[in-house]
Design a protein with these regions (language model features):
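Glycine-rich phosphate/pyrophosphate-binding loop and the adjoining helix
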Residues: 119-120, 126, 130-230
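Short, small-residue-biased leader/transition segments that mark boundaries at the very start
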Residues: 1-12
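Helix-loop-strand module that forms the ligand-binding subsite of alpha/beta enzymes
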Residues: 12, 36-135, 218, 222
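N-terminal beta-loop-helix "entrance" segment that forms/cooperates
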Residues: 13-33, 151-158
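Positions that flank functional sites
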Residues: 15, 65, 148
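Residues at the starts of beta-strands that form the adenosine-phosphate
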Residues: 8, 107, 139-141
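Short, flexible, glycine/charge-rich loop motifs used to bind or transfer phosphoryl groups or to couple energy/partner
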Residues: 1-3, 45-47, 97-99, 192-193, ...
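Structured loop/turn residues at beta-strand edges in well-structured enzyme cores
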Residues: 5, 18-21, 51, 103, ...
Length: 231
């Protein structure tokens, strides 16, 4: 049955996050010590919240074909929670080192957004979290990739939905994804497909756009311009 679910979130740009210095203090052979930033920034508190959570949603825009620098800086701080001198083998058969499983191995959802329509644009982020899952034994229970950000807008917009009805269905799919996470702890494949669908109202757009044929791409650009609502 449905239950009340809390979704606390952390906005990284509002948090104080220092970068890993690769100083090696946390991996000292004599005495593994806390990160040098342990008492001076917000990372330890964020790790505690992650440890207490049932699952984690890693959400990021695509910046220059990768996740945001802030998210990458934060994830690099996981180094201090592992023991690199103790080798292990992941469930996928990959050699790695001892990790803080209570943080790193939580089930997670990857949520990526970008303005560009090409499938290559978010691929580095998708690949990163796929690799993360394999090495850390963290089940990826959902992958939501929303391209065409300038077309779909940043929230409910009746004008956009009237112009492009697919947008309404996409937002409904995201709401359904939230319900499924709360009730079942994972997003159904069909829901992911609805949420990730192309919103450009052209037949077979997702298939045809893979063809790197410039005249055809120019036609797509013209159609995309028609969809945009002047702010």
């Amino acid at each position: 049955p449905p239950r009340s679910t809390l979704f606390p979130y952390t906005t990284l740009f509002r948090s104080h996050i220092e970068r890993c210095l690769a100083c090696g203090r946390c991996q000292s052979k004599k005495n593994q010590r806390p990160c040098v930033h342990e008492q001076t920034d917000d990372v330890a508190a964020i790790f505690r919240r992650m440890k207490e959570s049932d699952l984690i949603i890693y959400a990021t825009p695509v910046y220059v074909f990768a996740m945001s620098g802030l998210l990458k800086t934060f994830l690099e701080r996981l180094y201090a929670k592992g023991v690199v001198s103790e080798l292990t083998v992941s469930k996928k058969g990959l050699i790695f080192h001892k990790i803080a499983a209570a943080i790193c191995s939580k089930p997670f959802v990857t949520l990526v957004c970008c303005d560009n329509l090409e499938r290559e644009t978010p691929q580095n982020v998708i690949d990163y979290f796929d690799t993360f899952s394999k090495f850390t034994d963290a089940p990826q229970v959902g992958l939501l990739v929303r391209n065409g950000g300038q077309l779909s807008g940043g929230g409910k917009d009746p004008m956009r939905e009237e112009k492009v009805p697919k947008i309404y269905d996409v937002y409904e799919a995201y709401r359904q994804a939230g319900r499924e996470l709360a009730q079942a702890g994972r997003i159904e494949r069909a829901t992911q497909q609805r949420a990730n669908r192309e919103i450009v109202p052209l037949p077979f757009f997702s298939l045809i756009k893979r063809l790197h044929f410039r005249p055809l791409k120019k036609k797509f650009v013209e159609k995309a311009r028609e969809m945009m609502v002047t702010r």
